[in-house]
């Protein structure tokens, strides 16, 4: 019985953004937006939103317990986990997006994914993969509401801080490239 050589397996198609990472400027800007708070806190104020710490790092959905609200974190922990979360957002964007992005678009999607998570960003990813950048921009701009529990009922409210952030994240998808033929006129 002869051993047959193994059939070569087709290489997985490379994603068009496989070598991209968040720019230094965008990462620094996001670090300013995600202000470091060196303790656990509720991201929408007293008894509202989700239990969060550091640079907008989700501890868990729902408000912090009184024990958690007393928990302090140090700058090193914030920096380490922020870096891990940014790297995770970059991997998600690289894996999820099948069309070419420019650096500003990649940066914006990393920021969106860091903040909204892969599930929150998934509709935007679908629109971008259909090359519907205008639709993606509109979708990002609508992502300004968060769930809170009020009088025992879950309700959505506008998070004022997200309005500016979503405008910045959607901007690279609103900008339409000028066709080369238009430049030569």
What are these regions (language model features)?
Residues 1-42, 48, 57, 73-86, ...:
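Long, amphipathic alpha-helical surface segments
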Residues 30, 105-113, 139-140:
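Short alpha-helical scaffolding segments that buttress acidic/His motifs in well-ordered protein cores
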Residues 43-68:
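Substrate-binding/active-site groove segments that recognize
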Residues 47-50, 106, 110, 133:
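Short runs of predominantly hydrophobic/aromatic residues within well-ordered alpha helices
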Residues 53-54, 110-114, 126-127:
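Amphipathic alpha-helical segments that form the core helices of the histone-fold
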Residues 98-105:
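Structural motif
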